[in-house]
From Swiss-Prot:
Organism: Dechloromonas aromatica (strain RCB)
First-level EC class: hydrolase
PANTHER family reported for this sequence: GTP CYCLOHYDROLASE MPTA
Gene name per UniProt: folE2-2
The organism's place on the tree of life at top rank: Bacteria
Name by which UniProt lists this protein: GTP cyclohydrolase FolE2 2
Residues annotated as site: May be catalytically important: 152
Family to which the UniProt record says this protein belongs: Belongs to the GTP cyclohydrolase IV family.
Length: 270
């Protein structure tokens, strides 16, 4: 025998007597299709992993988890970077919250041309759009993980021939005041690495990238400083965090460095 909806208890809406607010509560790691416009004027259809949270006042026992999924499905396949702020607003309205947070992580593909042979191939990059809303005010940022090659200056200096090199991940999280293509952030990072990566290389290309890295050695410290200098000079970037992790080829650990800067509040990270 079915029970009328009006008679089903709403436990989440009941009062909580502990009087402790929750900063973030919601759903994590839910996949949903999205579309992303790329710089070549094409549309990439991909799958994003979403984390969606709201703040919960001290006097409420719980939030309504099903409503997060309803928000995703209400947009069907029309979720994009452009309507990301709309999703934030919809979420706090539907969840009756003052604050909200959404992370949208997805693979992004860029067509790259090999440096000598000219063969083309796709490279994938890990991208996350991050949005926060507090009392109607929205703040967004983009996080891009760029895989590159790094070659050790010390190894080159002390060795009679060769030098140890490895793949590195340079991660830029940027808060911008104007639109920036994902490709622009990727290119900025790749230009400051020992060498960029490619999906497909022929033998002449492999020779080129090997020698390019050897002629352009960089410590992990060099990498974050050089990328930070470029971001400092980029007027569209208000604040950033740049990280570099070198997956050391001669050690069983990584080398790591981080620089963060809020240009509007330079003393914040002094």
């Amino acid at each position: 025998m079915s029970t009328p909806t009006s008679n089903i208890p709403d436990v989440q809406n009941s009062a909580d007597t502990r009087h402790i607010a929750i900063n973030k509560v919601g759903i994590k790691s839910i996949r949903h299709p999205i579309k992303v416009q790329d710089k070549s004027a094409g549309i990439q259809h991909t799958i994003a992993m979403f984390n969606m949270y709201v703040g919960l006042p001290h006097n409420f026992k719980g939030t309504h988890m099903s409503r997060f999924v309803e928000i995703l499905n209400s947009h069907e396949r029309e979720i994009s970077v452009e309507n990301f702020p709309t999703m934030l607003r919809d979420m706090v309205v539907k969840l009756e919250a003052e604050t909200g947070h959404i992370e949208m992580n997805f693979p992004y593909f860029i067509n790259k041309t090999a440096p000598v042979s000219g063969v083309q191939s796709l490279m994938d990059y890990d991208v996350t759009f991050i949005g926060d809303i507090c009392h109607g005010e929205i703040a967004t940022s983009v996080k891009v993980v760029v895989p590159v090659t790094s070659l050790c200056p010390c190894s080159k200096k002390i060795s009679e021939y060769g030098a140890h090199n490895q793949r590195s991940h340079v991660t830029v999280t940027a808060k911008t005041n104007d639109f920036m293509w994902i490709e622009e952030i990727v290119q900025l990072v790749e230009q400051e690495a020992s060498c960029e990566l490619f999906g497909l290389l022929k033998r002449p290309d492999e020779k080129y990238v090997t020698e390019r890295a050897y002629d352009n050695p960089k410590f992990v410290e060099d990498m974050v400083r050089d990328v930070a200098a470029r971001l400092n000079a980029e007027a569209r970037v208000d604040a950033y965090v740049v990280e570099s992790e070198n997956f050391e080829s001669i050690h069983n650990h990584s080398a790591y460095a981080l620089i963060e800067n809020d240009k509007k509040n330079p003393l914040a990270h002094a």
